C-alpha cells in the first residue's frame, strides 16, 4: 500500500523541529536541532528526518512551515501556518483530550486554550527573557541539570523557595545564592517554575 507522506517544520528562534507523517496519522521520523531561524538548523532538521525515513523531499505530498522563521522556507514549504494553530492541532493529535497547551519558546511563553484541535484563546508573555526557554536553559546550566529534567526534579520539591526576580540575570544570582546556602536543587527548581507561572 502506498503512503502519503507530509512534512512539518517549526523554525523557532532557538531551535528547529521537523516531523514526517505517513497518511496524516503515523509519525515516521522527527528531528530537533538546537539552532533556529537564520542558521543551518532548519535544513539540518529536514535532512535528518528525510534520512531517518529513507525519503526525499520530492516524495512529500505536502510541506508545512511554522514558527518564528517560517518565512525563510518559502521555496520548500507548500504553505505556512501560525505556530499557535499548529500547537493546537499537534497537541490534539498527540493528546486528544487536551484543553491547555503551554509553549515555552526561546523568546516568549504562550498558553493556549484548545477545544477539539482549535485554539479558542491564548495569552503570551514576551517581556525580556523572563519565563522563556532561554531563561530555563540558563537556570538548568547554573543548577547543573538537564533542562528536560527540570519538570521531574521540581515535582520532587518538599520546601517552598521563592525566586522573585523575573530578570534572567537577577534570577541567576538568586539561584546561585540559594545553592551557596545549601538549598536543595529540587526546591530551587520548584521556585523557578512558580516564578515562570506567576
Which positions does each model-derived feature cover?
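Short glycine-aspartate micro-motif
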Residues: 4-10, 62, 99-102
Amino acid at each position: 500500500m502506498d503512503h502519503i507522506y507530509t512534512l512539518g517544520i517549526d523554525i523557532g528562534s532557538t531551535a528547529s523541529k521537523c516531523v514526517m507523517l505517513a497518511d496524516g496519522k503515523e509519525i515516521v521520523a522527527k528531528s530537533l536541532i538546537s539552532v533556529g531561524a537564520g542558521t543551518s538548523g532548519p535544513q539540518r532538521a529536514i535532512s535528518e528526518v528525510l534520512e531517518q525515513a529513507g525519503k526525499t523531499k520530492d516524495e512529500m505530498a505536502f510541506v508545512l512551515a511554522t514558527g518564528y522563521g517560517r518565512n525563510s522556507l518559502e521555496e520548500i514549504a507548500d504553505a505556512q501556518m501560525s505556530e499557535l494553530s499548529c500547537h493546537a492541532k499537534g497537541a490534539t493529535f498527540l493528546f486528544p483530550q487536551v484543553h491547555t497547551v503551554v509553549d515555552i519558546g526561546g523568546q516568549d511563553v504562550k498558553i493556549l486554550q484548545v477545544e477539539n484541535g482549535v485554539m479558542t484563546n491564548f495569552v503570551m508573555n514576551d517581556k525580556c527573557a523572563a519565563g522563556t526557554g532561554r531563561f530555563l536553559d540558563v537556570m538548568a546550566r547554573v543548577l547543573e541539570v538537564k533542562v528536560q529534567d527540570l519538570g521531574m526534579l521540581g515535582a520532587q520539591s518538599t520546601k517552598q523557595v521563592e525566586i522573585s526576580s523575573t530578570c534572567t540575570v537577577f534570577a541567576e544570582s538568586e539561584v546561585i545564592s540559594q545553592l551557596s546556602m545549601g538549598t536543595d536543587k529540587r526546591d530551587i527548581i520548584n521556585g523557578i517554575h512558580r516564578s515562570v507561572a506567576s
